[in-house]
């Protein structure tokens, strides 16, 4: 068991290298996003207090990527989106499966990036489908998504029997991903923590750009500076000291 956050991060770095090897062997692009992208640009590695890794894959490649990640060898374990071992959001996770509770294990969050339709009406339809898909995958109301979304998803969860949730899940998935093979101006990490701010010009992701991350080169969005500024503002500025804390590492060392 780790005694320091740095040891925790080093486990995640090994997991990231394994992910990179799997995806690149299949010709699948991925990007470090979120705090991992900031870490790459500001620290050339992990943000010193960060305790997970955020990775994004374009929706058109996502199912194939999940198939590859399910082949990771022990002690690494991939938890697919629709398996939802830990029901937090419809995204995939890679864990260090070493016997501890998975909620406390080193992990990589794996997000799908969806094309956003250019039509505002179609975008609203996609947003509706994303809410329905969320509750159908997790089988519980959406958290931290606003009062309306919580009420709406609570109604679906409480009123629909399992067979109907299964049907709605497949239908909603088709609605969310209907534009995956089309060229659109914008893309979004729909289930990212920044909500509507996750919608960015498609060119921000572009062709992955490799930069130093600890002792390896890892891909970030082509226009990572613009991407991070759009979502986080002045991302090169350190947050207040009281905010420089890990999300769940403390559970491990207590």
At which residue positions do the language-model features occur?
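A short secondary-structure junction signal
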Residues: 120-125
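Solvent-exposed, non-transmembrane amphipathic alpha-helical segments
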Residues: 43, 50, 57, 130, ...
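Glycine-centered loop/turn positions within well-structured domains
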Residues: 63
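Active-site nucleotide-donor binding segment shared across nucleotidyl transfer reactions
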Residues: 20-53, 57, 66, 203, ...
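Short, cationic low-complexity segments
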Residues: 128-144
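Conserved catalytic core of two-metal-ion nucleotidyltransferases
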Residues: 1-24, 66-118, 138-143, 150-233, ...
């Amino acid at each position: 068991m780790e005694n320091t956050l740095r040891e925790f991060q080093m486990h995640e770095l090994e997991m990231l290298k394994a992910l990179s090897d799997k995806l690149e062997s299949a010709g699948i692009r991925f990007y470090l996003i979120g705090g991992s992208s900031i870490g790459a640009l500001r620290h050339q590695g992990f943000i010193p207090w960060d305790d997970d890794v955020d990775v994004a894959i374009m929706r058109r490649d996502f199912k194939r990527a999940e198939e590859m990640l399910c082949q990771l060898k022990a002690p690494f374990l991939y938890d697919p989106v629709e398996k939802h071992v830990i029901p937090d959001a419809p995204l995939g996770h890679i864990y260090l499966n070493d016997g501890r509770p998975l909620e406390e294990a080193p992990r990589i969050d794996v997000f799908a990036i969806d094309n956003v339709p250019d039509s505002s009406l179609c975008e609203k339809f996609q947003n509706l489908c994303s809410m329905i898909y969320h509750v159908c995958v997790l089988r519980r109301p959406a958290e931290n998504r606003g009062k309306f979304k919580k009420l709406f998803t609570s109604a679906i969860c409480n009123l629909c029997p399992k067979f109907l949730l299964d049907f709605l899940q497949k239908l909603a998935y088709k609605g969310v991903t209907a534009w995956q093979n089309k060229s659109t101006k914008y893309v979004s990490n729909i289930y990212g923590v920044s909500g509507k701010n996750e919608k960015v010009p498609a060119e921000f992701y572009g062709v992955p750009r490799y930069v130093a991350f600890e002792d390896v080169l890892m891909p970030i969005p082509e226009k990572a500076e613009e991407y991070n500024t759009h979502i986080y503002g002045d991302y090169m500025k350190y947050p207040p000291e009281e905010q420089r804390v890990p999300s769940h590492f403390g559970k491990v060392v207590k």
